[in-house]
Amino acid sequence: MRTDPESDIVRCLLEGNEGQAMQYIGDSHGALTYGVSKHAVARAVRRRAAEWGQAGITLNAIAPGMTETPMFRGAADHPVIGKSVEAIPIPKTRVASPDEIAGVIEFMLSDAAEYMQGSIIYVDGGTDAQLRPDAF
């Protein structure tokens, strides 16, 4: 089984250790929910892009990878979650700076991105491409 907060929770439940599972859930600060919510945003953008585009509404999203923020630092420094963070492959071998993410957002809000519609822009140092090389 992989070493990540969700796997730790499932392992504890399979072993009948509900108390430890609850501890992991509390420690993970909603890691599972956070990941699922990012997927939900991406799916909503893709499903609404055509309809909203016809109404003149531009709809795109950014999918940032690990970025040096207080939330990232809290996870990276956590004694349990930090191990999972370290295990995430980043081909660029570092986390993003907030300015790097902001630059992509600035482009997406500019006239240069006027023709973009229904796009999810991954700014993750290549993590998505490495983990899902055939997904578009």
Segments the model singles out, each with a brief description of its role:
Residues M1, G53, G103, G125-G126:
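Glycine-centered small-residue hotspots that permit tight backbone geometry or close packing
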Residues Y34, H39-A42, A61, T69, ...:
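C-terminal helical subdomain
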Residues G53, T58, M116-G118:
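Short, small/polar-rich loop/turn modules that mediate ligand/substrate recognition or access, typified
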